[in-house]
Amino acid sequence: MSSSVEQKKGPTRQRKCGFCKSNRDKECGQLLISENQKVAAHHKCMLFSSALVSSHSDNESLGGFSIEDVQKEIKRGTKLMCSLCHCPGATIGCDVKTCHRTYHYHCALHDKAQIREKPSQGIYMVYCRKHKKTAHNSEADLEESFNEHELEPSSPKSKKKSRKGRPRKTNFKGLSEDTRSTSSHGTDEMESSSYRDRSPHRSSPSDTRPKCGFCHVGEEENQARGKLHIFNAKKAAAHYKCMLFSSGTVQLTTTSRAEFGDFDIKTVLQEIKRGKRMKCTLCSQPGATIGCEIKACVKTYHYHCGVQDKAKYIENMSRGIYKLYCKNHSGNDERDEEDEERESKSRGKVEIDQQQLTQQQLNGN
């Protein structure tokens, strides 16, 4: 009923994130909305939520997470009050086990929490301002360090901040410290670990399987993204589709096909390096080397994000055409094909005219 009311009001009322109840797209990433319009959530709010795990099913997903899981996490958040603003929806917990601080994503930023985000390694973690730590080589070292050294609580800077502990104590009254920790991270229904699998790109620390340099996942996505080709000498890997549509990769001819998915390995490595600076229009993660063919358009995607955002892929093997048009410009592909055909005919006509002119000059001599 609520969704129909929102649809009637339309322009006068914008959809808000189910976690932070705001429209803070700049801080929290793109606001993603399910096809049935019933679920809306910022990508960062989902990405860092403690109990969300990636979904590899064929069912509808939202930012790499199943709709059902997102709804469960939003429901769980109604019982979790933010350590900063004291409002519900705070599903992002400090990654130190004994800490029970929970946040909305934008509240974590405002409270000067440390955001650790390394998509290539599958790391999406938050440390509250009390437990911020730097200069660690690995996340395992970070957890071990926190377990060995109790950090002194920071002194309150103002009266306003000194009051923030009371609502948290009320919410967890009567619970043990271990119970508080698992409740804030949603691990009461799943096995507790210091390295929770909660993102579309996260893997366990012991998982050494190769992952695509573009989309940061492995062979589990081969069916949708093509075979994962591995180049052991350079410790590089990439899905076929991710390479095929990347703007700077060069596909080799049939007479000089290499083992790396028929692509020039140098161009693939260059694209992977370039992708580290290219953030996806949909998920805001690096590796988005597939750009819309319209020159004035700045949208870039991972292959699967382009599919999810309803971009249009043009794949013509006989002519070697592999292009993407974002959903705003998907109607331009037919006009683009016509332009190419006209250009091809024009080039052919110019070549014939040049041949005739050369022949006339020879006859004249």
From Swiss-Prot:
Compartments (UniProt record): Nucleus; Nucleus, Nucleolus; Chromosome, Centromere, Kinetochore
Signal peptide range in chain numbering: none
Residues modified as Phosphothreonine: T358
Zinc finger boundaries on the chain: C2HC pre-PHD-type: 14-52, 209-249
Compositionally skewed regions (Low complexity) per UniProt: 354-365
Keyword line: Acetylation, Centromere, Chromosome, DNA-binding, Isopeptide bond, Kinetochore, Metal-binding, Nucleus, Phosphoprotein, Repeat, Transcription, Transcription regulation, Ubl conjugation, Zinc, Zinc-finger
Basic residues composition bias: residue spans: 157-171
Annotated spans, Disordered: 139-211, 330-365
Modified residues (N-acetylserine): S2
MF annotations from Gene Ontology: DNA binding; histone binding; histone deacetylase binding; zinc ion binding
Motif (Nuclear localization signal): 13-16, 129-133
Record-annotated membrane-spanning stretches: none
InterPro entries in alphabetical order: EPHD (IPR034732), PHD-type_Zinc_Finger (IPR051188), Znf_PHD (IPR001965), Znf_RING/FYVE/PHD (IPR013083)
Comp. bias (Basic and acidic residues): 342-352
Description of its domains: The PHD-type zinc finger 1 mediates both nucleolar localization and interaction with UBTF.
Role summary: Transcriptional regulator that associates with ribosomal RNA promoters and suppresses ribosomal RNA (rRNA) transcription.
Protein name: PHD finger protein 6
Annotated source species: Bos taurus
Native organism taxonomy: Eukaryota, Metazoa, Chordata, Craniata, Vertebrata
